[in-house]
């Protein structure tokens, strides 16, 4: 049968919200419309966009926005129906699972830590951080591979916490998800034919191009349709699981 790989976008796929970034903006009562408009006009690259958005978050309060505060703001993230069933069933049948997203790393790592391996945490390519492993998975590594954007911790604060760096975490380019999928395939020994990708927007067509099963889920608009093999509009990842099981000949739940 061979090995299989499923690559999942996070925002509007695993997370039932416009984006993990937007969830934080909503909590703080701020808007990134200005930087978003500049990016769409080609006046900002993605690296500068992330830095501007982090500056917006940091300037939203007279008190320093610490790493711990930002983590707190992300608690209560709404999750998509069937997210846990999808990932757990795939793992139960030895399918390799990756999150490939431009969203914030905190949520992706929390998701990944829900599925711990039997191995102690270690720093690795596509792994989670020590803090998440300690807080969420009893110090164990995750079975998933995680690639996201977000923030970096800065120098210690007076209260013992850590600040937020002016420079963001930039692992996933808007149009570079296909390169991440290809690296995963090469490292994990999985063919394109045995790879499925699930995403909602044009930012995911790079993943689609490297996958034998490209699933457009909860479409943001119609543009990605021509790049996908399948379209699922209902916000239920159980339907995605059924499709992937059928495509790869896996047992269904």
Briefly describe each language-model feature range:
Residues 1-55, 62:
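Active-site neighborhood of HAD-like aspartate-dependent phosphohydrolases
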Residues 8, 38, 98-99, 195:
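Short glycine- and Lys/Arg-enriched binding-loop motifs that mark or flank ligand-binding interfaces
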Residues 13-14, 43, 76-78, 150-152:
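Residue-level preference for alpha-helix termini and adjacent loops
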Residues 13-14, 100-102:
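Ser/Thr-glycine-rich phosphate-binding loops at phosphate-binding pockets of nucleotides
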Residues 32-39, 62-70, 120-122, 135-143:
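Short, surface-exposed acidic
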Residues 74, 81-96, 103-253:
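C-terminal cap/substrate-recognition subdomain and adjoining C-terminal extension
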